[in-house]
Structures are given as structure tokens and as C-alpha cells.
């Protein structure tokens, strides 16, 4: 005889939308990544509201965001560069981030590979003057000389080693003698009048330095800083972080908390008839 199933309705708990417990913050990046420094917003991020001793800002610090450099600079020529930003401080409803790495898109890397040429790559671990420990990867390819008729452009092992040594020397010297902000300028160079320069428009980028000096050993092209990893970071300095946001829009946004103005209290005097 089959067991009779108990009749009765199953009552489940009322489903609550988890986003009702969250609030949205504006994610901002240093002004050096933008064509217009006043507009340094990269997006929004949700976080649970402050409850008791659990602060919303603690849940935001340390988050890593990946943003296309083309979107920030409004420049389609930089569409293959991806910038990583890490949340360092929270001011009102603004999340202030700093550089945390760079990478190339996979389709860009695949498009660089061609036959009849030699691929040369290297990486270095080096520390900036302000205490950031970086691992920088570089890549380049040999090419045919101007008067070369042979279709292949393979380089001998001795030439490859010489170019690789030159790449390591340039990366080590440039990164170790500058702070993180200047190093980023060398990484995200823009093209001005056909000459590759850094964001300030004065010095060649790291990739351009390697191309110029490496070509004296053997003709090379398609030189790129393939990846940058931030291995160690110093303690966050609020003053230095605020310098990265000079002339930005963060100061024009009202804070989340309403702050009143102090008013002097006047005592009323009573008279008896």
C-alpha cells in the first residue's frame, strides 16, 4: 500500500531583492587617464549599506576594476589596452582608484604573430621611487631591412640576446628612476604629430625607446609593453592620492551625509509681572 503524501501548502520565505540593501558609488580614476581631467568617472559599483560596525567603505577598498583605455581617453587607437584600477580610498560617494596593472587584449597579441620573423620578449621586476614593485613584460618582433630582398627576417641568437639585454636595461632604468605616475605616463603614450610621446608630450614611451635603441642592433617593429603587474604596493598616502585627482570633478560632488551649520544659541530672558 502506497504511503499517502501529506497534504499541505509549502510556505517559503518571502524573497527579498538583494539590491534593496545596497547603495551605489561612483568609481573614479586618476586624471592622467582621461582626455578631459574634469570627467574622470569610469562607472558605478554597488556595496551593502553600512550596518553597525560593518562599514560600506571597507567593502569597497581593495576592489579591482578593468577598464579600456580607449573609453577613458576617447581614443580608438588605444582600444587594445586594458587598465586595472584598485580602489584605495572612499570620499563621500566617490571611490578613488589608482593604477594596478595593464594588459593587452588577446586579439591584439594574436595579430602581432607573423611568420618569417623572430619574436623577442623579456620581463623585469623593478621598484619605483615611491615604493611600488612592478613586473613589466615587453615584446617585439624583427623585420626586414630597407634594402633586404630575402623574405625572412630571422635574427641570430647573439642579436636576440643583445636586443633582450637592451630591453631589460631600458625598462629597469626608466622604472627605477621614476614614481608610479610618471611610469604610467611612459606606458600610455599618445601620438602627437606622428611622434610617439608620453602623456605630457615630451619623452618617448617605453616601447618607443626600445624600438629606437633596439633597431641599432637589428631592425625591429611592433614593440609593446605587453603586461604590467603590481606585485607590492606601499601604504596608501592620502595626500599623494589626492594629487592624482587634481582639477577633477570629485570636489564638486556633494558628500553622502548631510552636514548642518553651527548656530549660536541665545538664551531667552523672562520677566515677572
UniProtKB/Swiss-Prot annotation:
Ribosomal protein as UniProt keyword: yes
Keyword Ribosomal protein: yes
InterPro entries reported for this sequence: Ribosomal_eS1, Ribosomal_eS1_euk
Matching Pfam families: Ribosomal_S3Ae
Subcellular location: Cytoplasm
Subunit and partners: Component of the small ribosomal subunit. Mature ribosomes consist of a small (40S) and a large (60S) subunit. The 40S subunit contains about 33 different proteins and 1 molecule of RNA (18S). The 60S subunit contains about 49 different proteins and 3 molecules of RNA (25S, 5.8S and 5S).
The protein's name: Small ribosomal subunit protein eS1
Amino acid at each position: 500500500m502506497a504511503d499517502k503524501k501529506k497534504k499541505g501548502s509549502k510556505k517559503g520565505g518571502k524573497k527579498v531583492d538583494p539590491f534593496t540593501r545596497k547603495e551605489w558609488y561612483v568609481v573614479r580614476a586618476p586624471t592622467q587617464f582621461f582626455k578631459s581631467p574634469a570627467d574622470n568617472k569610469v562607472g558605478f559599483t554597488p556595496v551593502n549599506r553600512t550596518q553597525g560596525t560593518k562599514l560600506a567603505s571597507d567593502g569597497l577598498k581593495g576592489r579591482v576594476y578593468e577598464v579600456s583605455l580607449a573609453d577613458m581617453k576617447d581614443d580608438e587607437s588605444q582600444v587594445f589596452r586594458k587598465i586595472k584600477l584598485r580602489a584605495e580610498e572612499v570620499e563621500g560617494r566617490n571611490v578613488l582608484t589608482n593604477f594596478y596593472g595593464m594588459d593587452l587584449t588577446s586579439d591584439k597579441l594574436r595579430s602581432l604573430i607573423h611568420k618569417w620573423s623572430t619574436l623577442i620578449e623579456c620581463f623585469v621586476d623593478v621598484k619605483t621611487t615611491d615604493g611600488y614593485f612592478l613586473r613589466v613584460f615587453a615584446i617585439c618582433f624583427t623585420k626586414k631591412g630597407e634594402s633586404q630582398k630575402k623574405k625572412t627576417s630571422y635574427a641570430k641568437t647573439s642579436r636576440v640576446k643583445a636586443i633582450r639585454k637592451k630591453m631589460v636595461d631600458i625598462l629597469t632604468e626608466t622604472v627605477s628612476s621614476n614614481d608610479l605616475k610618471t611610469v604610467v605616463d611612459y606606458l600610455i603614450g599618445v601620438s602627437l604629430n606622428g611622434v610617439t610621446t608620453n602623456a605630457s608630450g615630451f619623452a618617448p614611451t617605453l616601447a618607443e625607446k626600445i624600438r629606437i635603441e633596439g633597431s641599432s642592433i637589428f631592425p625591429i617593429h611592433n614593440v609593446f609593453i605587453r603586461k604590467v603587474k603590481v606585485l607590492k604596493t606601499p601604504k596608501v598616502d592620502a595626500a599623494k592620492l589626492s594629487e592624482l585627482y587634481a582639477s577633477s570633478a570629485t570636489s564638486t560632488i556633494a558628500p553622502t551625509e548631510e552636514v548642518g551649520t553651527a548656530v549660536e544659541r541665545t538664551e531667552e530672558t523672562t520677566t515677572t509681572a
